[in-house]
């Protein structure tokens, strides 16, 4: 019988942003092969773990209504995969829209795993077997464990960190539509696309990086836009802002990101677009590694 977590733990679960997403094939088991440059935002959900005799789950916050309850919740599914995990009462403050292409549910599952491992040091978050089991819950979960800028290959399990990646100032927009990842994959016309070229060297500045990103793709965007035309409206709104350097969809959508030269420009764009589209979820952010912020805090 496992004991409750010995302390209160709070974990930040940052949004995951696919700066690029090349779909390069499909395995016989149906999983798609990816080649993606991923960064993490300084906006996200917050998961709190408190001692309990049985697993408990409560969701609060502005996006709580759309989160599934009970056994279908990814937080509880991830916790159940950790052998002998201490019991906890989870409180998830849900700030990210669900089914939005920015890894919200996967980030929450990874946060639960990190929190439980921090509360019981004999559990290793880098255990390969456990990470493999987490992958069965979602291809984004392993990358969300580390929260570092990385090149992601395979089906999501091959993670190559990108050192000294420059901070990118961005605006995230979701048009308040949920998109099914399996539906987008099903709608794709081409699954065997070219992989990414080499990522620019560490000495690359932001201007050169944006130029390189402009030459890359999100191979899921066309299919996602066919299913949800609002994605095209979001991208056009971002591209129409005078300061936007690049706009693209993240993941399977419907969230898009726009890159801006400075934090001030991103904040101004967020204000302008929020005024023009008050029904959308819009956040200014900085993209890069969030590994330090994602470290669980014990109290």
Curated annotation (Swiss-Prot):
Disulfide bonds: none
Protein name: 4-diphosphocytidyl-2-C-methyl-D-erythritol kinase
Top EC class for this record: transferase
One GO term of the biological process aspect: isopentenyl diphosphate biosynthetic process, methylerythritol 4-phosphate pathway
Annotated catalytic residues: 16, 140
Organism, scientific name: Roseobacter denitrificans (strain ATCC 33942 / OCh 114) (Erythrobacter sp. (strain OCh 114))
Function: Catalyzes the phosphorylation of the position 2 hydroxy group of 4-diphosphocytidyl-2C-methyl-D-erythritol.
NCBIfam families hit by this protein: ispE (TIGR00154), PRK14608.1 (NF011202)
Enzyme Commission no: 2.7.1.148
PANTHER family: 4-DIPHOSPHOCYTIDYL-2-C-METHYL-D-ERYTHRITOL KINASE, CHLOROPLASTIC (PTHR43527:SF2)
Keyword Nuclease set for record: no
GO molecular function, one term: 4-(cytidine 5'-diphospho)-2-C-methyl-D-erythritol kinase activity
Record bears the keyword Transferase: yes
Keywords from the UniProt entry: ATP-binding, Isoprene biosynthesis, Kinase, Nucleotide-binding, Transferase
């Amino acid at each position: 019988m496992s004991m409750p977590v010995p302390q209160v733990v709070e974990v930040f679960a940052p949004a995951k942003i696919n700066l690029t997403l090349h779909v390069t094939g499909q395995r016989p088991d149906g999983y798609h092969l990816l080649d993606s440059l991923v960064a993490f935002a300084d906006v996200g959900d917050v998961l709190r773990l408190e001692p309990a005799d049985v697993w408990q789950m409560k969701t609060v916050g502005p996006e709580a209504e759309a989160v599934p309850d009970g056994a279908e919740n990814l937080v509880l599914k991830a916790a159940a995969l950790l052998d002998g995990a201490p019991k906890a009462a989870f409180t998830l403050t849900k700030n990210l829209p669900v089914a939005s292409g920015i890894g919200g549910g996967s980030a929450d599952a990874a946060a639960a795993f990190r929190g439980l491992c921090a509360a019981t040091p004999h559990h290793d978050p880098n255990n390969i077997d456990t990470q493999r089991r987490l992958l069965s819950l979602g291809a984004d979960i392993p990358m969300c464990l580390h929260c570092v800028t990385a090149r992601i290959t395979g089906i999501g399990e091959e993670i190559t960190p990108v050192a000294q990646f420059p901070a990118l100032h961005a605006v995230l927009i979701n048009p308040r539509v949920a998109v099914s990842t399996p539906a987008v994959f099903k709608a794709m016309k081409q699954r065997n696309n070219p992989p990414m070229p080499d990522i620019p060297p560490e000495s690359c500045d932001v201007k050169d990086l944006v130029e390189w990103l402009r030459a890359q793709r999100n191979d899921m965007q066309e299919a996602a836009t066919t299913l949800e035309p609002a994605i095209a409206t979001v991208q056009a709104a971002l591209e129409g802002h005078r300061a936007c350097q690049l706009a693209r969809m993240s993941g399977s959508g419907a969230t898009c990101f726009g890159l801006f030269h400075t934090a001030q420009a991103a904040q101004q764009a967020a204000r302008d677009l929020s005024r023009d589209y008050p029904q959308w979820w819009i956040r200014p952010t900085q993209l890069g590694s969030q590994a330090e912020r994602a470290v669980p805090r014990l109290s």
